[in-house]
Amino acid sequence: MNIVITGGAGFLGQRLAKALLHGSCPLAFDTLILADITPPPAPQPDARLQCLALDLSQPGAAERLIDADCGVLFHLAAIVSSHAESDFDLGMQVNFDATRQLLEAARHRAPGMKFIFTSSLAVFGGELPPVIDDRCAVTPQSSYGAQKAMCELLINDYARKGFVDGRVLRLPTISVRPGKPNKAASSFASGIIREPLHGKQAVCPVDAELALWLSSPAAVVSNFIHAATLPASAFGALRTLNLPGISVRVREMLEALRAVAGDAVAARVRFEPDAAINRIVAGWPGEFDTRRAQQLGFTADESFEQAIRTFIRDDMPQGGG
């Protein structure tokens, strides 16, 4: 049995691959294929690993990835929120068209395979109830959110028809990400923690009282793998789940940073409002009812302080400051 990760060169793809290759992983497989538009690095030496440079928007790309031996696909590849908003055509090609091609390849070449899709809080926007659950209607207010919402509906229908065993995971905003800022509207949610810990200044473009639904990378990767271990019957007819997270205001994030790293580190963050970013992020819900996911065994961080300490432990070997 083969496992495929699209977006395999990205931060989450690399973390997921490393976790899958670890001896404690509950998933047994023969080959792990990492695919991305740039050649994915091997997270560690392993004879089971294959790394492919592949543009999923090109004809035939999906068929190169999926054959009869493919048992699980983690579809992580995407054009992120602000980039998809500024380049509509590219967002549609990568976020929607490529997903449909992967679904078609799975339907015809590996029917019934587990198709695990990473969706987003951006499927929600506008006027929303105070707390969101799995059955709230999607109301995207951005091109990225619309593309993700269309994919959710398509995967649910492919699962209903028995073409694939679809599992849609709506990810919280991930914080704290290592590395450099990207074009996602939510990039600041890691930047206002990561940069000060590295001794750099950081800009927060949104209001201090804005509530975010957050998860650490470690919790998200653990939930990815858990999603692949569950039987199809666990999901029932509704194949979309809001993953557990923690609701934290930006002000509380900075208070947690201060508690972990001290006043001098927290003082490296300044507020410079960006109306476009604030509009996008403020449209995302800040609180979810994830009882269904929790009953299925998905988990969240204990606190945002814990998420910061985990980042320092895993991604800053010399410690923060």
Predicted regions and their residues:
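Active-site Tyr-X1-5-Lys
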Residues: G126-L128, Q141-R167
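NAD(P)-dependent short-chain dehydrogenase/reductase
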Residues: N156-A211, P217-A219
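NAD(P)H-binding glycine-rich loop region in Rossmannoid oxidoreductase-like domains
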Residues: L56-V94
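Mid/C-terminal beta-alpha module of Rossmann-like enzyme folds, strongest
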Residues: P196, N223-N278
